[in-house]
Design a protein with these regions (language model features):
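Generic alpha-helix initiation/capping and coil-helix boundary signal
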Residues: 1, 6-8, 90, 156-157, ...
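Secondary-structure capping and domain/repeat boundary segments
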Residues: 25-102
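GH16 jelly-roll
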Residues: 101-381
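Secretory targeting and sorting signals
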Residues: 1-24
């Protein structure tokens, strides 16, 4: 650059000409662009540049159950820039990833109207983390009604441990019950089987936290493989602590035995005399079953369409059993009240003989509850 003499500068100044200042690029002229993950795991990314324009890099942040929309100028701001947009700035900036929750598609139920999504758990979370304690309680063996309706009946040879269920950290989001063949008692838990216990497993439920009355209730599960496994997705009446079983009612939406992996069954259990706390000679049940795929080889959907005085049990979109208040073997229909959800893998005779496996897994993708035929309520306790 040519030097301008002092005399020339003085002449220009006297003539009223503004003289621009010229500053060299120094550290003070370096700006930073900070990219924030905003609501998901990940480390913020900082880019330093002396330029006043910059092309944003392809987003590397991910958030399970959400799709990336672009970048905002504040954590709750509107979209300001698209992915890989070129931005212009005169000072350091901080941009926040903008996310939109991915909503599941409504299931198709023949002859029925599925309404709004009322509640769901997609089981998103870091690998090995616990299930959502706002919704679920992991149980130990304890036959008190306050303990998830009572656990480890039927001479089931397992210790239930809350630690035996955890999230797998996958993009899809799963809760996994790991059942193990063991040869020594674990440090925690109780065995209530009179013949002794040989397995550890898990059971968790929404008792005292979330209850449901009517609607379309659906889960997607890959069932455990091997004899002795006894997985189930089911419900008990919320009033079990006051009226007991079977008067409270039991809905087995999906129940399987590991020795018959192609058979899925479901049932209603109820009272024959309508008397509270009168177990167990007054108990009866109705059930249905469906033989289909190997349910332990892949994921399948299990659902219940529940409206006043009617329950349809469904596997992979196929209604395999319908119960009504006039079709069951008792006048005491207990299924027009709030119920809570239970997911477990028991072990026992229903699953057949042990087939020498050392570990099995029941993988639960989601649980979703929709309104059905304008019926459906969720109660957050």
């Amino acid at each position: 650059m040519k030097r301008i003499g002092i005399t020339a500068l003085l002449i220009l100044a006297l003539a009223g000409v503004t003289i621009p200042s010229v500053q060299p690029a120094t550290a003070s002229g370096t700006h930073s662009i900070t990219l924030m993950p905003n609501g998901t795991s990940g480390t913020s990314k900082i880019v330093r540049t002396t330029s006043h324009s910059y092309k944003l890099p392809k987003v590397t942040f991910t958030r399970a159950g959400y799709t990336f929309l672009g970048w905002a100028k504040s954590a709750r701001g509107a979209k300001a820039y698209s992915d890989r947009a070129t931005i212009r700035f005169t000072s350091s900036v901080k941009l926040y990833a903008l996310w939109k929750e991915i909503m599941p598609a409504k299931p198709a139920v023949a002859g029925r109207t599925v309404g709004n999504l009322l509640w769901r758990d997609e089981f998103y979370g870091a690998t090995g983390s616990s299930i959502n304690a706002d919704y679920w309680t992991g149980r130990y063996c304890d036959q008190a009604d306050e303990n998830g309706g009572g656990t480890c009946h039927n001479n089931e040879p397992q210790w239930y441990l809350p630690s035996a269920v955890a999230l797998d950290g996958s993009k899809a989001g799963n809760a996994v019950i790991t059942t193990k063949r063991v040869y020594a008692a674990p440090a925690e838990g109780r065995c209530l089987a009179w013949s002794g216990c040989q397995f550890t497993s898990a059971r968790f439920d929404t008792q005292g936290k979330v209850a449901f009355k009517y609607g379309y209730i659906e889960t997607r599960i890959k069932m455990p493989a091997g004899g002795r496994n006894w997985p189930a997705f089911w419900m008990l009446g919320e009033n079990i602590t006051s009226v007991g079983w079977p008067q409270t009612g039991e809905i087995d939406i999906a129940e399987q035995g590991g020795n018959t992996p192609n058979r899925n069954s479901g049932a209603l259990h109820y009272s024959t005399n309508g008397v509270a706390n009168d177990c167990c000679g007054n108990h009866t049940y109705d059930y249905g079953s469906y033989n289909g795929a190997n349910y332990s080889a892949d994921f399948h959907t299990y659902a219940m369409a529940w409206t006043p005085n009617r329950i349809d049990l469904i596997v992979d979109g196929i209604v395999f059993k319908t119960f009504t208040s006039t079709s069951i073997r008792s006048q005491y229909w207990s299924f027009n009240n709030p119920f809570f959800l239970i997911i477990n893998n028991a072990t026992g005779d229903f699953g057949g003989a042990w087939t020498y496996w050392t570990e099995s897994q029941m993988t639960i993708d989601y649980v979703r509850v929709w309104k059905l035929d304008n019926q459906g309520e969720v109660f957050i306790r």
